[in-house]
Amino acid sequence: MRQTSSVPTDAAEDRLAALARGDKWYLADGCGAIWAPPFPVWLREPGFWDPANFFELAFGPLFCVAVVRADGMGVPLVQTRRDWRPDRLVSTYTTPDGMELTETKAVLPAGRFRSSWTWTGLKGTAFLVAYSAQTPQPDAKYTRTPDGRSIQWEGVATARNERSRSRGVELRLSAQASPDAPHASSVQRCQSTTCHPEWRLSPFPESWEPGVGLAPIEFMPGIDDRGLDWLGLSVGIEGETGQGVCFELDATLHEPGIEADLPSEQHWHEHFDSYPAFRCGDAFLERYFDYRVYGLHLCEVRGPAGNLKHPAVAEGIEYFHSPITYSGQCHMLETRWSRSPRVARGTLLNFLDNQKPDGSFHGRVYTSALINTDFYHANWGDALLAVDAIHPDAAFLRRGFDGLGRYFDWLTQSRDPEQTGTIEVTNHFETGQEYMSRYQAVNASADADGWVSRTRLKGVDATVYAYQLASALNEVALRLGDDAAASRYTEARKRIGSAITDRMWDPDHKLYSDLEPNGLSRTGVKAAVCFYPMLTDLPDTAQVDAMLGHLQNPDEFATPWPLPSSALDDPYFSADARWQGKRHLCPWNGRVWPMTTSHVIEGLIRQYKRRDALPDATRQRCGELAGQWIERFVRMMFHHGDLARPNCFEHYNPFTGQPCEYRGIDDYQHSWVVDLVITGMMGVSVRADRAGGATLTLDPLPGVLPQAEIHSVWVRGRSLTVHREGTAYWAELDGQRQASTIGQPIQFTLPPADAAPVILDAGRVPPPRAGKPTRPPAEAM
């Protein structure tokens, strides 16, 4: 395997240290291996006994560590302290006789689960023993090194996803310690009983050799393959104080014979160094910016592994630890701000690599078989242009254009065969927004039908996504010089845009609406997705003003924490996650979902920047509300307002801000925040032109921050810094500085992309190139 590396900076260390806390335990290698059990049972025990994930595949237990006396008796450990930061989890233990031990857990690239130990107060000698229990397999092979330092365990296919598909996993348990320390290993097969990480329940105490450690019993398979295989390594320790004992479980799932491109052991520092640094007068906003940067790497996955060939971001932990289309749009917006474009591009490329023959996408890219992968609507058009604007690449743009063109054809032909310009939703899961009035309005049993496609709803969200995709494909076609394709997508864009404007706008409710499929009558259901047309260039002044009225109405959407997924006056509304009286895991009938909130804030930012289409008063309202909501949105994602405890759960109570902790899924990458800060708070936007160049515009939101600065924003290989102070701000692009006031944009002209330096990886900083500053256009002054 290859490992990229660079020298980490002090700034990255400071950013990691600032996220330290005592109530968290998630660890990941940034490649697909992650230890983040939602409800850990054995968190107070040494090692990794609770399950881990390799991509979508769960496996466990891994291993635990015991302190054992020379005579084989286990020493009770009491965990007295736990300190977490993204790159490690440090636990302190004490024993009844006054010994104190410190364990440092980490998950390193290539699925290496490491437990390192130091101690003080040891009297005499003792042993540290790492051991694991695994389900036997007929073709499993066990190899022990003669020095007793490692056990290789091959061919075990116990890693499974939630749909019971499995892949083989190779495990190697090893020990690192002083060459003089006694080492021993043992593998024993036992009939099944409870599988707890308690030394006294393992088979090893009864085969212990006093003063030597584990007895090297010859492995015997027994009369059948049922039961548990126990693997153990013992290391002798002595001295009042000591260090240097390390146990490591290497779990391998990468394709055999294929060399994986892995980061170095400093991968967390390299990751933070690759993203802009943001500082501001709002401690919560500043902290959360880096917390989202952390979440992106926690959920990063890399191939090659089965169907996954490119780096990407998984939607979350546990069974969400795979690329999913619905959140893929978010990840492309967020990760485009890394110096390296690999993850942003890879997010789309993984779906294109596995595109179905009919042009549709798998909803999830599993490393295992692509069966029952579902389907989700997503805003691929905006995501493609967003990545290309920051990291232009002709080959990627062409690949995206061709693949998304096929997807668009499938979407419009299968979900709008009558060519009405509206896109059909066929069940309540494929929008990612189940259990809400939208679907009940056209199918009274939509909630009970599940994934069965009995619902027919012309969805605002799905139709807006189609409009944005047609617009993006039209723009790319023009840049590629494909006039025929440009003409075709222009017509499609007009057809879909007219349907949104003429059919989906409800003049009575003054809000966009879903449509029933037959007569295309409006359902009148008020939901957060009804504001998604603000992502487009379609709404006029009256429509934007009307939508602002709904968003600021305390009887509809103006809750303390923005934005309820369904209006407060919806007959099914519930703030506490109840649907039909029963608390659900993922209801959308009133809870605040960061996904929809980031959509609507993004729409407000875009309307604020429509200087050529909307009057200043309307734009100002959009900008002020966007800024206020970014602050409230971010503040919501801290446990009880505690600055040290940011989170990102799936959904929240709109009145109290209480997250769905009962669900157990924290650090859910199902929204965007980094992009809102950079494009909204700091006003950065980039628009490519047909000649291959681009215009960089700075237009920060009004009245949100007294002071803020972001630096190391990499735009087409150039370094950008933006600083705002009160109503003044300045931007510097590779030494070229311009100053202005909030409300007056700054622009830089960037030359064609082929003149920009190539960024090879996140650890390498490209040399600076100056952009040409220009005055903003007259209408922006």
Name every feature range the model reports, one short phrase each.
Residues 129-132, 150, 155-157, 176, ...:
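Short, well-ordered alpha-helical packing segments
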